[in-house]
């Protein structure tokens, strides 16, 4: 009886710990640029911020940049839409981050927070 209870407790603990590894996907939507900037200045700030953190930033046309972060065997890809007034960072693709339609490995959100912070710092 004790063995069965112990097995059940271990199984529940494993499920709880496994669930802690994922979190809802974080997107940054319409973050204000702040002071008046041109679209080119906003693009330069985004590219500079991403590059400083190891992101590969690739302009995809007016108002859009694709950012790719490669860490060990993980890959995160985001679309960054911007204007002179706002910018948005949205999930696009990933590998080895256990993306499941709305949740992803918890480290992803930290990478997005760092990117957002670096962009904001360059725009102030």
Regions found by a protein language model. Give the residues of each.
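Bacterial N-terminal signal peptides that target proteins for export
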Residues: 1-7
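Generic detector of short alpha-helix boundary/capping microenvironments
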Residues: 7-8, 38
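Sec-dependent N-terminal signal peptides
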Residues: 8-14
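C-terminal motif of bacterial Sec signal peptides marking the signal peptidase cleavage site
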Residues: 16-19
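Ser/Thr-rich, low-complexity intrinsically disordered terminal regions
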Residues: 21-124
């Amino acid at each position: 009886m004790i063995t069965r209870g112990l097995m059940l407790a271990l199984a529940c603990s494993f499920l709880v710990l496994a669930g802690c590894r994922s979190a809802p996907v974080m997107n940054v939507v319409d973050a204000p640029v702040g002071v008046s900037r041109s679209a080119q200045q906003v693009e330069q700030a985004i590219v500079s911020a991403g590059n400083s953190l190891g992101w590969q930033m690739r302009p995809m046309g007016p108002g859009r940049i694709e950012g790719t972060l490669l860490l060990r065997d993980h890959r995160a890809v985001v679309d960054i839409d911007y204007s002179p007034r706002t910018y948005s960072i949205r999930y696009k693709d990933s590998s080895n981050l256990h993306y499941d339609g709305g949740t992803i490995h918890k480290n992803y959100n930290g990478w997005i927070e760092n990117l957002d912070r670096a962009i904001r710092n360059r725009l102030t």
